[in-house]
Amino acid sequence: MENRNKEVRRVLIEEGPIDEHRQRILRILGYLGGESAWNDLKQILKGNDQEARKAVLQSLGSWPNGAPLETLSDLIKSEKDSIIRAMALRAYTPLLSAPSYLSDEMKTESIKEIYEINSSRSDKRNLIGVLALLATEEALKFAESLAAKDDNLVASYGDLAYKRVSENLSKVFSVKEDLNVLKSSDALVFGEGSFAVDETDGSVKGWSNPQFYLVWPVNFPESGAYDISVNAATPSGGGGEFEVVLAGERGIARTANNNEYSDIAVGKFEVKEPGTYRVIISGITIDQKSGQLMNLRSVTLKSN
């Protein structure tokens, strides 16, 4: 990835393509991501070339981590050009909804602040959509205040967000010990058909689509590093790759080659600030078209 970014940057900086091609390259760089790429794009956003700034903003909503959030937030609050400001908000919202270094508490405060800034109804609706993903008491209070608005559309979105945040809060796990086990039966389960908790052993089964996923809202009272492993079995004809996400960090692992429950190490994850974050497990690939990824019983966070 970084090598591809270097080549794109070389063409952009050294060969100086004409404006139309330059804008296309800026958009490509925005989709690819990477620390060096972001440093270049950030300088463009701080500059005066309006067309180049727009080209960068068009792709930042798909950035692979939360690196652009602070810069985009500053643009939303202080940019004088209304088009640039609106584009920054439309890039900021999907990034805010994705896992990142920002805790749910920080995301809640950001949504409350930005919601009051003049923006379109669709932009406000999208912000409420992000609010519905969170698991904080402040998010619940803000959703409740939106549900009480005279604007019927805002009120309906606020009511939906209130219900979602209430459900999220009911699932919050608070880290207390060196060894913390998140049971699949306590997760928020997102999928279709038979993808659900099996009451006989408490595992989630029916993982027939790699896009299915589970979420645990977890409150970390302090910063720290954690080794994460999953306890799972591979059903006959199944198996594949999966991803674990926490606080914007990602780890990829493969299922075991047997149908017995066993622990699968994923990697070390760092929580840099106290707060509530989501542990997310999603599929990447399933080895056989008609197979199932795994039967997932639990996730373990071990402090180190």
Language model: regions and residue ranges:
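Specific register positions within alpha-helical solenoid repeats of the TPR/Sel1-like families, i.e.
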Residues: 93-97, 167
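Eukaryotic acidic, Ser/Thr-rich intrinsically disordered low-complexity regions
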Residues: 147, 151-170
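Short inter-helical turns and helix N-cap capping residues of alpha-solenoid HEAT/ARM repeat scaffolds
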Residues: 17-18, 48-49, 80-81, 119-120, ...
